[in-house]
């Protein structure tokens, strides 16, 4: 009960601090989905999670780096009890099991996921880094999954590196059309298509913001 109240409080706080709004090009759905977005800050998954309709949030789990979220008791509580995150070790040598198996287990348990296929926060001048292969491997293992690109705009300026408090600016999470792995689609083709779909939602992409 306390965790649910905290989750609702976090969602409200994020919307108040960032002026967050969600723009949907696909219809919100309780179907198993993977929401994948651009990665500019540790607040990214909270932004996407907060932008989802309340009825969907309980079944949507963020995929997060274990080394960051297990540093202290508060972070461990938040990621486990409030956000119900799926923790992945970034260093393969530290992993006790395959990361894709862990994600498939979460999906098989009835969850949708939030993840960031760039693999690390983008601190470059490029709008989007190349995608890691994990997005394809998850799609290959569970081809029935729908993948939803989500472009987060302005969060890097709301939560700038080195600042203790967020700066109030308007943030937008734009949810694009769903896509699935094609029957004969290879890794490079799928990753390129998924990346292009996400980039098209940005102000710098071909499609522009919704």
Regions found by a protein language model. Give the residues of each.
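Helix-to-loop junction immediately C-terminal to a conserved catalytic motif
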Residues: 2-41
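Short, flexible loop segments at the rims of nucleotide/cofactor-binding pockets, characterized by
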Residues: 10-18, 90-94, 125-126
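Catalytic core of membrane glycerolipid acyltransferases/transacylases, capturing the structured
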Residues: 29-92
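Short coil/turn segments at beta-strand junctions that form active-site/ligand-binding loops
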Residues: 31-32, 58, 109-111, 145
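Short, well-ordered beta-to-alpha junction loops that form the rim of enzyme active sites
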Residues: 38, 117-119, 152
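N-terminal/domain-start segments enriched in small and hydrophobic, helix-friendly residues
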Residues: 50, 96-128, 172-208
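Hydrophobic/aromatic ligand-binding patch that stacks against planar heteroaromatic rings
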Residues: 78-79, 105, 137-141
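A cross-family acyltransferase "interaction/gating" segment
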Residues: 112, 123-186
């Amino acid at each position: 009960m306390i965790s649910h109240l905290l989750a609702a409080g976090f969602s409200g706080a994020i919307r108040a601090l960032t002026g967050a709004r969600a723009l949907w090009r696909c219809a919100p759905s309780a179907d198993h989905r993977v929401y994948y977005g651009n990665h500019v800050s540790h607040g990214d998954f909270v932004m996407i999670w907060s932008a989802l309709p309340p009825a969907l949030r309980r079944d949507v789990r963020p995929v997060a780096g274990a080394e960051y979220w297990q540093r202290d008791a508060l972070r461990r509580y938040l990621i486990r009890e409030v956000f119900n995150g799926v923790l992945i070790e970034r260093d393969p040598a530290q992993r006790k099991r395959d990361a894709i198996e862990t994600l498939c287990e979460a999906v098989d348990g009835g969850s949708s996921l939030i993840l960031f296929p760039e693999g690390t926060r983008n601190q470059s001048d490029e709008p989007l880094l190349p995608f890691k292969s994990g997005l394809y491997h998850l799609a290959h293992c569970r081809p029935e999954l729908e993948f939803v690109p989500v472009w987060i705009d302005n969060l890097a300026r709301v939560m700038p590196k080195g600042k203790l408090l967020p700066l109030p600016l308007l943030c937008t999470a734009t949810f694009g059309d769903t896509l699935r792995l094609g029957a004969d689609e290879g890794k490079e083709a799928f990753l390129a298509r998924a990346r292009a779909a996400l980039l098209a939602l940005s102000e710098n992409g071909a499609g522009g913001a919704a």
